[in-house]
């Protein structure tokens, strides 16, 4: 599942459109993950027991997540190196199960498609999905 030159161009062009709404997309994607996959709330229990998509910390962290995806777009030619610090943080300090990266990627795709339905063509879907799966693999790199 490597990214072709066309995939990379497609991801970059779509990110240019998404970036202005990335905080909202990230907050909604994280909120959806917490509702649809309630076991993921365990990683955020320090925010309190009322974790829901409208919780200010969910929205704030969603923006941080999308900042990480933006960093990945900038490092699209070497995701492992570009995301090594984030991989180390999630593996050794936060101890996040790397399976959650794919769950979150699914929710980011879903919300991005909702925000940009005309731009989210099947070709964009394929390229963004491949990209986010590569991001998930890069984030899991330090777990090995």
Swiss-Prot record:
Lineage: Eukaryota, Metazoa, Chordata, Craniata, Vertebrata
Lineage top rank: taxon: Eukaryota
Protein's UniProt name: Hemoglobin subunit alpha-B
Disulphide linkage map: none
GO aspect biological process, one term: hydrogen peroxide catabolic process
List of residues binding heme b: 90
Tissue specificity of this protein: Red blood cells.
Keyword Metal-binding among UniProt keywords: yes
GO molecular function: haptoglobin binding; heme binding; metal ion binding; organic acid binding; oxygen binding; oxygen carrier activity; peroxidase activity
Organism this protein belongs to: Seriola quinqueradiata
GO cellular component term of the entry, any: blood microparticle
Segments forming domain Globin: 2-144
Function: Involved in oxygen transport from gills to the various peripheral tissues.
Binding site for O2: 61
Keyword set, alphabetical order: Heme, Iron, Metal-binding, Oxygen transport, Transport
Quaternary structure, from the entry: Heterotetramer of two alpha chains and two beta chains.
Record's keyword annotation contains rRNA-binding: no
Assigned protein family: Belongs to the globin family.
């Amino acid at each position: 599942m490597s990214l072709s030159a066309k995939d990379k161009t497609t991801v970059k062009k779509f990110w240019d459109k998404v970036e202005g709404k990335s905080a909202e997309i990230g907050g909604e994607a994280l909120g959806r993950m917490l509702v649809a996959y309630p076991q993921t709330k365990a990683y955020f229990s320090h925010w309190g027991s009322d974790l829901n998509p409208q919780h200010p910390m969910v929205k704030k962290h969603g923006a941080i997540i999308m900042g990480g995806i933006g960093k990945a777009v900038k490092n699209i030619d070497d995701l492992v190196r570009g995301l090594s610090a984030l991989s180390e943080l999630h593996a050794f300090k936060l101890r996040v199960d790397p399976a959650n990266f794919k769950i979150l990627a699914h929710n980011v795709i879903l919300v991005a498609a909702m925000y940009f339905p005309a731009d989210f063509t099947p070709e964009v879907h394929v390229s963004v999905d491949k990209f986010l799966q590569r991001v998930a693999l890069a984030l899991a790199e330090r777990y090995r």
